[in-house]
């Protein structure tokens, strides 16, 4: 069976199938990044904003683990926001 035959049997257009696939991928990514953010919040028992303030206030005392975690957490937070935007755009897309 070819891909074209499978698409035909679904009764959906190629665009609809692609949109659904993209949405499922985006939801999966969002879930992953939400879980990673939750791990950092649990580990440090504070929000990202509060953790940023704490790490930035400790300029004389370097804690490489916390600084690395801050960079990771900032990346994860940015990725979470980006995927959320993609989900919103996919919901609005034709």
Predicted regions mapped to residue ranges:
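Small, basic N-terminal interaction modules of short regulatory proteins
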Residues: 1-55, 81, 85-94
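Short, glycine/alanine-rich amphipathic alpha-helical segment
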Residues: 57-72
């Amino acid at each position: 069976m070819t891909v074209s035959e499978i698409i035909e049997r679904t009764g959906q257009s190629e665009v609809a199938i692609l949109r659904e696939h993209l949405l499922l991928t985006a939801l999966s990514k969002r879930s992953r990044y939400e879980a990673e953010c939750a791990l950092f919040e649990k580990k440090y028992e504070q929000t990202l904003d509060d953790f940023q303030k704490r790490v930035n206030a400790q300029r004389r005392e370097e804690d490489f683990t916390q600084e690395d975690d801050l960079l990771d957490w900032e990346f994860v937070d940015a990725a979470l926001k980006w995927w959320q935007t993609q989900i919103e755009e996919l919901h609005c897309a034709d």
